[in-house]
Amino acid sequence: MSAPASTTQPIGSTTSTTTKTAGATPATASGLFTIPDGDFFSTARAIVASNAVATNEDLSKIEAIWKDMKVPTDTMAQAAWDLVRHCADVGSSAQTEMIDTGPYSNGISRARLAAAIKEVCTLRQFCMKYAPVVWNWMLTNNSPPANWQAQGFKPEHKFAAFDFFNGVTNPAAIMPKEGLIRPPSEAEMNAAQTAAFVKITKARAQSNDFASLDAAVTRGRITGTTTAEAVVTLPPP
């Protein structure tokens, strides 16, 4: 029986070897293997989309529903802005209860407008779409979100006290023609992120992850962790 051929290159040999890898680009690149050049990057147009923001298709569907509800077409945008401004005050979660009726919706309550939105996307995704509009509106009128103090925001960060604040700088949101009156400051961004983290932590503190209802395990508590314990166990900055 002959010995298997050696695949080891002799020591000192100057003969080059070529190694093929699974990720190598073919010599003749076409189709999905095409290599982009500078012209592509300078001329290509990207359509910005975010799964945190309502899409243009979503807005078209909501617009059709609102038309059926007899929301006037000529004030429909203002009705949307009013609703989102209201959400900056009361919140945009699925559990948020809308209050009263805005001045642009032909007597249709904000609750009904929000219910129609939820047939297409989440209320927060809708609010994220108009966050830059509401940001400018609040700054122009020096009117921060109503609950900024209750949420623990400092006065200098009060305009960031709404739960879709991240939409202000999201490129998929609708931007006013003049742009932002001013961009959010780093301190405002940090305050908004901190508030969101604390809110999530408190919500988790209300959940029950016990595997048993035995009092020896639950210690008579309904929730798994108290809010105080949750805050104490927050990771350091």
Curated annotation (Swiss-Prot):
Keyword terms, alphabetized: Capsid protein, Helical capsid protein, Ribonucleoprotein, Virion
Localization: Virion
Record GO cellular component, one term: helical viral capsid
GO molecular function: structural molecule activity
Region span, Disordered: 1-24
Annotated disulfide bonds: none
Subcellular location, principal: virion
Pfam families per record: Flexi_CP
Biological role stated in the UniProt entry: Required for genome encapsidation. Forms ribonucleoprotein complexes along with TGB1 helicase and viral RNA.
Family named by the database record: Belongs to the potexvirus capsid protein family.
Protein name (record): Coat protein
